[in-house]
């Protein structure tokens, strides 16, 4: 799946992949609804991570590529 993702791709977070991951444990457990329910845009890529911007007034976040799916 990672081969399909590139800068500018629209993505959605895969809840099953994100839950109980290191990234989830490092975050507040009360994730906002937009995190799983909306799409984001990949702004940058780094090996196995993507910098994702959601279309809400919140900071962009780094997520593992295996936690994302193309929309």
From Swiss-Prot:
Single GO MF descriptor: quinone binding
InterPro entries assigned: NdhO
GO cellular component, one term: plasma membrane-derived thylakoid membrane
Domain of life: Bacteria
Keyword vocabulary terms for this entry: Membrane, NAD, NADP, Plastoquinone, Quinone, Thylakoid, Translocase, Transport
Catalytic activity: a plastoquinone + NADH + (n+1) H(+)(in) = a plastoquinol + NAD(+) + n H(+)(out); a plastoquinone + NADPH + (n+1) H(+)(in) = a plastoquinol + NADP(+) + n H(+)(out)
EC number: 7.1.1.-
Membrane topology type: Peripheral membrane protein
UniProt-listed Pfam families: NdhO (PF11910)
Class of the enzyme per the UniProt entry, highest EC level: translocase
Classification via HAMAP family: NDH1_NDH1O
Function description: NDH-1 shuttles electrons from an unknown electron donor, via FMN and iron-sulfur (Fe-S) centers, to quinones in the respiratory and/or the photosynthetic chain. The immediate electron acceptor for the enzyme in this species is believed to be plastoquinone. Couples the redox reaction to proton translocation, and thus conserves the redox energy in a proton gradient. Cyanobacterial NDH-1 also plays a role in inorganic carbon-concentration.
Self-association state and partner proteins as the record states: NDH-1 can be composed of about 15 different subunits; different subcomplexes with different compositions have been identified which probably have different functions.
Membership in a protein family: Belongs to the complex I NdhO subunit family.
Full protein name: NAD(P)H-quinone oxidoreductase subunit O
Gene: ndhO
């Amino acid at each position: 799946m990672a081969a399909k993702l590139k800068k500018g791709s629209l993505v959605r977070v895969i809840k099953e992949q994100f839950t109980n991951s290191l990234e989830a444990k490092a975050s507040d457990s009360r994730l906002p609804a937009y995190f799983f329910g909306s799409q984001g845009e990949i702004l940058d890529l780094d090996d196995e991570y993507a910098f994702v911007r959601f279309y809400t007034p919140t900071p962009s976040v780094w997520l593992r590529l295996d936690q994302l799916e193309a929309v």
